[in-house]
Amino acid sequence: ATCVVIKGHGVLLRGASGSGKSDLALRLIDGGAGLVADDYTELSVEDGQLFACVPQTIQGLLEVRGIGIVHLGCVPRVPVAAIFDLVALSDVERLPEQQVETIEGVSVARFAIRGLDASAPAKVRMALKAHAENLFHST
């Protein structure tokens, strides 16, 4: 998984190779997010909170397809606020129920989006805001 931080909230980006994890991370970073870890993220639980950490061997490195591996500053450890699974368009529900995933006993909001969509960075930010402020409308 790749992880970025947006306003102190860790966002895990998961998906198969080529699903757009690093690309979406790059677009989020270009919009003000910070890099935590690209391609591999260590997870741990402390006081009931899930944390994402960067392995030292890849600290500050981001793979940019077509450019190469670039050195960036990074945030080495953040609390995880949400998980985004990057899936095929056919696997994205139009009006999904709110979902959570339990990792090491901690429940985390989970969303499924197409990572290569132009709107993917906006969807990540919107979902974080809606989750944090309880803005979801029940269908």
Task: List the predicted regions and their residue ranges.
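Short, acidic/polar N-cap/turn motifs at the starts of alpha helices
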Residues: 1-3, 40, 98
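Extreme N-terminal, non-catalytic leader segments
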Residues: 1-9, 14, 46, 129-135, ...
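Glycine-rich phosphate-binding P-loop
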Residues: 8-29
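Conserved nucleotide-sensing/catalytic segment adjacent to the nucleotide-binding pocket
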Residues: 30, 34-88
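Conserved NTP phosphate-binding and transfer environment spanning the P-loop NTPase/kinase superfamily
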Residues: 77-139
